[in-house]
């Protein structure tokens, strides 16, 4: 595996693969890799000739009071995992490599980016869309892989690619979970043992939402209230966002009527904000399927 730190070096390294018509699979990450990231890598390796992973903690997507400074970083550890996973290239630029001067160009996708998580984190998804579009311009991948745990991000990236006619296939990969159901996340490392035990309430709340919906609870406000009450049984968990939305448009739904719905949860356990999502209903929506841009 070749580790690359600059944009020019990466472009030079990928040039032979392009000349030979090889397919490039790209997995953008912020590092501190876990089983979910490695599943994205596995899919990329299976479906492409060349696999490239980026590790970049993007300051544009962090608010003033968020965890940019303490976000877990261990490039040596991550490089070892990617080497074992038979990745071809690791792109690990610095902030000055990616943003040599203050950015004046911003990619935003309202109203998708202003809803759900965007309501609590203004500007977050503009930062995500900006860095992902820049990475796509640098890498020029044939396919890029994103986890469905960050479902809103996946919807936004798909829309950005469609709107901007970026020639990359966006592949959503099912959420990878720990044995007890907690979604794999780099931020899980923040949890104390007691908090880690309490965090299981998050996937359990999604199970409860699925059960209630299938049993006939068709009012979105009632379903949100029931989920909030369920999470409230765990004193260490504070529900910050409970959203019932259309899984393609992220719009609020006046009535559910048995259709597929997105249940999005943001739950704070201690100082750690945990994110999880699930699409429930009678059929999977189109947005969770792979499609070409």
Curated annotation (Swiss-Prot):
UniProt GO molecular function: ATP binding; pantoate-beta-alanine ligase activity
Gene3D superfamilies to which the protein is assigned, alphabetical: HUPs (3.40.50.620), Pantoate-beta-alanine ligase, C-terminal domain (3.30.1300.10)
Sequence similarity: Belongs to the pantothenate synthetase family.
Reactions catalysed according to its record: (R)-pantoate + beta-alanine + ATP = (R)-pantothenate + AMP + diphosphate + H(+)
Gene responsible for this protein: panC
Pathway(s) annotated for this protein in UniProt: Cofactor biosynthesis; (R)-pantothenate biosynthesis; (R)-pantothenate from (R)-pantoate and beta-alanine: step 1/1
Name of this protein: Pantothenate synthetase
EC number(s) recorded for this UniProt protein: 6.3.2.1
